[in-house]
UniProtKB/Swiss-Prot annotation:
GO terms for cellular component: cytoplasm. Its EC number is 2.8.1.8. SUPFAM superfamilies: Radical SAM enzymes (SSF102114). The gene is lipA. It is found in: Cytoplasm. It is an enzyme of class 2 (transferase). Residues 74-291 form the Radical SAM core domain. This is Lipoyl synthase. [4Fe-4S] cluster 2 binds at residues 88, 92, 95. Keywords: 4Fe-4S, Cytoplasm, Iron, Iron-sulfur, Metal-binding, S-adenosyl-L-methionine, Transferase. [4Fe-4S] cluster 1 binds at residues 62, 67, 73, 302.
Length: 315
């Protein structure tokens, strides 16, 4: 059976989560929510990158999560690579990545990833993954293998990893990352603690904060980063409380963006946050001590990650 036959998406994926999705009236998108389509050279680069990814049997979160910035990022020659397959063991109802039973790890993926990054001549890459609760280390060793192979092939390339929470395997995962820590360690809190059972079934807010703090304690020179979505029913004050928690756990880089509903089978958008409010989040974050804060309607965790890393002194 091929992966598409076993991959659940939308309503099929979220049908068995503990807190059921309650349909809401679809809000009209405001004028500041605009998806940019590439043209000319950007369109050509977009097609080149897609062809290269298929040739090397690689996945990107840009495609699998239906990111609205895919045309802009591919058009500029950047991509966020998603390792360990395209099937996730979690059923998060905000995310468009498919759920199901994953395939065994591809032992050649680290080399194939490194070859692709080298061929694309990328100065900065983001490597992320699906959740792999089926693996004893949550996939930590595969991350490290990808980091090592990429550095061997492209010594000047800076590497950011966007990792899952390694539920129940955190101590093992942290020890493995000691072998080859990334240049930036990113783990997204996604939302406020009140909404965790609804938005992140299987995850734990305090556990995610612990991951970020303990990694930083082991690697004080490696910046830590986290991201949030708005529009799921949180309040501005709750977002600011999360920012304080992140700073209390030594997180230095931040992204906040507008949640956009991938399908009617996903959590509805309950509010569109005005750009002025995003600016307020950014101002408050910098006042709290974040080295860099990217806050805006179309911001995603790895959107312009290279520029954010540059602002934090990584590149």
């Amino acid at each position: 059976m091929d992966s598409t036959a076993r991959k659940q998406r939308g309503a099929d994926k979220t049908a068995r989560i503990p807190i059921k999705i309650v349909p809401a009236e679809r809000l009209k998108k405001p004028e500041w929510i605009r998806i940019r389509l590439g043209a000319g050279h950007e369109a050509e680069r977009f097609n080149e990158i897609k062809a290269s990814l298929r040739e090397h049997k690689l996945h990107t979160v840009c495609e699998e999560a239906s990111c609205p910035n895919i045309h802009e990022c591919f058009g500029k020659g950047t991509a966020t690579f998603m390792i360990m397959g395209d099937i996730c063991t979690r059923r998060c109802p905000f995310c468009d990545v498919g759920h199901g039973r994953p395939e065994p790890l591809n032992a050649n993926e680290p080399q194939e990833l490194a070859a692709t990054i080298g061929a694309m001549r990328l100065n900065y890459v983001v490597i992320t993954s699906v959740d792999r609760d089926d693996l004893r280390d949550g996939g930590a060793q595969h991350f490290v293998d990808c980091i090592r192979e990429t550095r061997a092939a492209s010594p000047k390339t800076r590497i950011e990893v966007l990792v899952p929470d390694f539920r129940g395997r955190l101590d093992v995962a942290l020890e493995i990352f000691d072998q080859a820590p990334p240049d930036v360690m990113n783990h997204n809190l996604e939302t406020v603690p009140r909404l965790y059972k609804q938005a992140r079934p299987g995850a734990d807010y305090a556990y995610s904060l612990r991951l970020l703090k303990e990694f930083k304690a082991r690697h004080p020179d490696v910046p830590t980063k986290s991201g949030l979505m708005v529009g799921l029913g949180e309040t501005d004050d709750e977002i600011l409380d999360v920012l304080r928690d992140l700073r209390a756990h030594d997180v230095e880089m931040l992204t906040i963006g507008q949640y956009l509903q991938p399908s009617t089978g996903h959590l509805p958008v309950l509010r569109y946050v005005h750009p002025d409010t995003f600016k307020m989040f950014e101002t408050e974050a910098l006042a709290m001590g974040f080295k860099n804060a990217a806050c805006g309607p179309m911001v995603r965790s790895s959107y312009w990650a290279d520029q954010q890393a540059y602002g934090a002194g990584v590149v």
